[in-house]
Each structure stands twice: as structure tokens, then as C-alpha cells.
Amino acid sequence: MCSFLDVEVKDRFVEGDFGMSEMVKSNLANCSSRVKRPMNAFMVWSQTQRRKVALQNPKMHNSEISKQLGVTWKLLSDSEKRPFIDEAKRLRDKHKQVSDYKYQPRRKTKSFLKNVYNHKDHLTKATDQLIKTQHLKEDSTTIYENTMKCPEISSFYCAQESTYLDNWMNLPPEQENTEFWQGLFTNETETCRSLPHGQMDCNECRSI
């Protein structure tokens, strides 16, 4: 017994109306009437080879099959490629007889172009940030190197660091928080006094 749903589906199938939009129908009609480009020698050869590889490896993905065929084709000698090269030439000559042929590459979708532009913008921003960071590092290194070239400043900082470290290592644990910091400022004053008068740096030395 046939239901109402079966009758409706069967009628739509017979009429050929699958609920497709007019744009989809138009694209299908254009694809069926469009003249395809002729195959090259590799495509002619891979037609039969692809079937063989697919039968031998049913679970192999199509992209992996293509990679394997590409490697195998490169390993073939010129004499082995010759029949397929001749066949490809015959197909090209036959294709030239079609006067209304026009190369029509596939149009890239808007979403694809948007992803390309977004990726390009991201790379540009990342590159700019990397350049700015590199410039900051170079400037800091140059300032430090120029500063340490001055003998008075270099010896002053080296003496400070050595004095602070020695005082801290020689302090008992119960006095490290008070005497260390008191000695720090005392040593700073003594170190500054050893410098020429115009290069004194601490507040006490400036008042001398």
C-alpha cells in the first residue's frame, strides 16, 4: 500500500525538482555543457594507475594516492612515458578543433579571499611587532655598551656591585636586613668620593 508521502516523493523525483535553487540548476547546466581542458601525459597515465592503487589499498586516502602516483611518474623513463605523451598530444590536437573553447578558471569564494586577507594582515602585524622589539633591544644594547666604555662609570658600578655582594655574604642572618642596607648607602658614599668631583652621583657627595 502506497502512502501519501511516497506518492509525493515519487512525483517530485519524476519531475526532477529536488528543491534546488535556480542558481544551482544553472551551475549544473553550465558544468555539463562546458568543454574541459585536455589531459596531460601524467593525467592520461594516472587514470588507469589510480584504479590499480585504489584496488590494492582500499583504505588509502585519495591525496596519498596522488602523492604516490606523482613519485612513481617521476621515476619512469622517457621511453615508458612516451605512449602517454603521444596520447596527450593527440588529445590537445583534438581539443584545438573546438572553436568555442575558453579557459575559465574557478573563481575563489569570498570566504577564501577573506581568510587570505586576514592571514596576511596577521603576518604584517606580527612582523611589525618583531621589528619594533628588535629595535628596542639594539637601542638598549648600544646605550649599555656606550656607558660601559667610560672607565670612571665602569669602575664605579663594578666597585658598587662587589661591595654590596661582599657585605651581604658576610652578614649574620639576624642582621642582614638592617646592617646590609645601612652599609649599602655608606659604601655608595665612599665609592663616589673616589671619583672626580664632577662625576659624584649620590646626594651626600653633591653637597660636598
Swiss-Prot record:
GO cellular component: cytoplasm; nuclear speck; nucleus
GO BP terms: brain development; negative regulation of transcription by RNA polymerase II; neuron differentiation; sex differentiation
DNA-binding region in chain numbering: 35-102
GO MF term (any one): RNA polymerase II cis-regulatory region sequence-specific DNA binding
Subcellular location: Nucleus speckle; Cytoplasm; Nucleus
InterPro entries: HMG_box_dom, HMG_box_dom_sf, SRY-related_HMG-box_TF-like
SMART domains: HMG
Domain of life (superkingdom): Eukaryota
Full protein name: Sex-determining region Y protein
Keywords on record: Acetylation, Activator, Calmodulin-binding, Cytoplasm, Differentiation, DNA-binding, Nucleus, Repressor, Sexual differentiation, Transcription, Transcription regulation
Protein task: Transcriptional regulator that controls a genetic switch in male development. It is necessary and sufficient for initiating male sex determination by directing the development of supporting cell precursors (pre-Sertoli cells) as Sertoli rather than granulosa cells. Involved in different aspects of gene regulation including promoter activation or repression. Binds to the DNA consensus sequence 5'-[AT]AACAA[AT]-3'. SRY HMG box recognizes DNA by partial intercalation in the minor groove and promotes DNA bending. Also involved in pre-mRNA splicing.
Post-translational modification: Acetylation of Lys-110 contributes to its nuclear localization and enhances its interaction with KPNB1. Deacetylated by HDAC3.
Assembly information from the UniProt record: Interacts with CALM, EP300, HDAC3, KPNB1, ZNF208 isoform KRAB-O, PARP1, SLC9A3R2 and WT1. The interaction with EP300 modulates its DNA-binding activity. The interaction with KPNB1 is sensitive to dissociation by Ran in the GTP-bound form. Interaction with PARP1 impaired its DNA-binding activity.
Organism from which the protein derives: Sminthopsis macroura
Similarity-based family: Belongs to the SRY family.
UniProt KW Translocase keyword: no
